[in-house]
Amino acid sequence: MPSPYDGKRTVTQLVNELEKAEKLSGRGRAYRRVCDLSHSNKKVISWKFNEWDYGKNTITLPCNARGLFISDDTTNPVIVARGYDKFFNVGEVNFTKWNWIEENCTGPYDVTIKANGCIIFISGLEDGTLVVCSKHSTGPRADVDRNHAEAGEKQLLRQLAAMNINRSDFARMLYTHNVTAVAEYCDDSFEEHILEYPLEKAGLYLHGVNVNKAEFETWDMKDVSQMASKYGFRCVQCITSNTLEDLKKFLDNCSATGSFEGQEIEGFVIRCHLKSTEKPFFFKYKFEEPYLMYRQWREVTKDYISNKSRVFKFRKHKFITNKYLDFAIPILESSPKICENYLKGFGVIELRNKFLQSYGMSGLEILNHEKVAELELKNAIDYDKVDERTKFLIFPISVIGCGKTTTSQTLVNLFPDSWGHIQNDDITGKDKSQLMKKSLELLSKKEIKCVIVDRNNHQFRERKQLFEWLNELKEDYLVYDTNIKVIGVSFAPYDKLSEIRDITLQRVIKRGNNHQSIKWDELGEKKVVGIMNGFLKRYQPVNLDKSPDNMFDLMIELDFGQADSSLTNAKQILNEIHKAYPILVPEIPKDDEIETAFRRSLDYKPTVRKIVGKGNNNQQKTPKLIKPTYISAKIENYDEIIELVKRCIASDAELTEKFKHLLASGKVQKELHITLGHVMSSREKEAKKLWKSYCNRYTDQITEYNNNRIENAQGSGNNQNTQVKTTDKLNFRLEKLCWDEKIIAIVVELSKDKDGCIIDENNEKIKGLCCQNKIPHITLCKLESGVKAVYSNVLCEKVESAEVDENIKVVKLDNSKEFVGSVYLNF
């Protein structure tokens, strides 16, 4: 073992950098959690970063440790416990690709078996206090049902007692060397993972000893093994490869079987050094199988217990997973207790092993068994294979007047027995997914090979929605191994939008009222032009490098012309499908057949009417377009937030008792939200501009709400929901609880990005959309019957401006977790 540490321990500069990072609103932000030590009146601060901030060239973190505990001492802060610098799987980031490793790293390469449990950090204070931490916490916790740090400490004390070692002596040894012992606690009686650790294999597996410095420094594996032997830890096996070539051969051989020396393992951790600095460099090599299969069995079991459904959407291991369910379901049905324990994480491995025993094979044997592999092949979908069983969906990407419906009708007229056409404008109910449900219902018919899902789909979110519906609903209508190819047809080249606007406007004028929703005579020129301009303004052209457009199996990009463009479009679509999928279009119809089908499509008359906006004075007036009263982010983690409030006020007996009473009496709001904008607050210039931006963003949802409202008024008998969910999200953190005699509110922290705080379905900021309230907040409870929710603004602004009197209670909340709210329109 190395000599005792005699270097500098104070890390004032690191703490300053962490505190600066704590104030960031976006990338690289640090989060603190103050922890009470179990055997001392001292505290430590746990620091962490978002997982996705590690390993980024564009983000420099103050420290790359995953697991960092610093003494709560403003004068002489020291690192109490430290985990490894975050390391990545082979190929996961640029600096774990083999060519980078070859150029920048040097051996020997120490390869240790990756233990499969929960990580535990063990260190000591100068006075002999033993400190045991989980990844991000230590000490007593009331917010979890399993305390990993406490469980790890109990196991440590058992092993020290067995070696007749005093805990304080062990703690002082760690302090003297200024190190953290890093171990994996593996014990199925405490918590099951994927690999099995029965009683005879349970314990703390020591796999590293890190020096408590900001810069990563760790002991060699021979020194780690010495400490493990001396203090009763279980040792992790270490194999050394002197060259990278030897290492890759070793890993390839083990990967072929998913095991090492006949034992199932999750993978390896490889330790080497950087050529340029001789600093330690870690990376990992994880096996996909059989752990993917085991995890899959765990997920389908949980899903069955929760939903009583054995339908699953995993693409691999379909045959053997169905065999597993055949075995497991009768056992689950026979015992609610087994189900209850399974959802808590117990009995997972036992049920898996019972199945393997009944099947007569191990997991590795199943994967390597030729007969089962053949059955897997037979039962799996070959997504690259196209044959007579393959079905097709066509998604147009268009704006109004581009001829998608005429083109679609032409194609269906050519193949009336095998092609179908479902129009979004023919679907009048509130359930948008009826478009996909009706399309799949039609596609499920034996004779139907292709269905055109006719909607404009002019934005990414609409295309994404179609793919999500398809994934969610497919197996409700079709056999699970039906291969569906999705063809995109783009009708509107982005570089011709100006020309498209002029031509499509003339087409809409010419067709007059021959459309379900855009009726020229009723809506008038101004309204129709406004609707069409809105579509063009929001149009997002196809981008095959970006989700969801990269999910299309084939994209047909049409040109745009003046005369008979639908006829030309139909011919191009037929030609391109014939080339890509001759099974669908074996022969291209003759020109006169296509022209006949085209002329028939021109006779098409809509049979369903959809109402958009309002008519002019010469027609029967349609109701005024109703806009939202307010726009909010509805909070999805209600129970978690209530529990967090309870924890944070636990030290105040009076508040705790009052809050308990408010919960019991039902006075606490049943749904929580953050108001983003309100129609009554939009009278000032900036607020008015923001409100207009929100309404422009959600034009489609507002129009759809009004369509449904009119249908309900005409006697559908359904009560319309006054809340409309969008696909946008809001991330936030809780800051402080504000409580006076009238109301209880929570001040929240949103992104301070000047561009806005709302994110779309691609996790990108929506420019210009921010919170209208000066102090973003949640109204938690009204204490007086007549008080308006808007009073929360007054209370929160008082607190933020330090105008706090004796009637106002303020409690700082734990803001380590980022919550998510879905943006809703409230009518």
Curated annotation (Swiss-Prot):
The keyword Lipid biosynthesis does not apply. GO terms for cellular component: cytoplasm; nuclear inner membrane; nucleus. The lineage of its organism: Eukaryota, Fungi, Dikarya, Ascomycota, Saccharomycotina. This is tRNA ligase. One of its GO terms (biological process) is regulation of nuclear-transcribed mRNA catabolic process, nonsense-mediated decay. The gene is TRL1. The keyword ATP-binding applies. GO terms for molecular function: 2',3'-cyclic-nucleotide 3'-phosphodiesterase activity; ATP binding; endonuclease activity; GTP-dependent polyribonucleotide 5'-hydroxyl-kinase activity; RNA ligase (ATP) activity. Its EC number is 6.5.1.3. It comes from Saccharomyces cerevisiae (strain ATCC 204508 / S288c) (Baker's yeast). It is an enzyme of class 6 (ligase). Keywords: ATP-binding, Endonuclease, Hydrolase, Kinase, Ligase, Multifunctional enzyme, Nuclease, Nucleotide-binding, Transferase, tRNA processing.
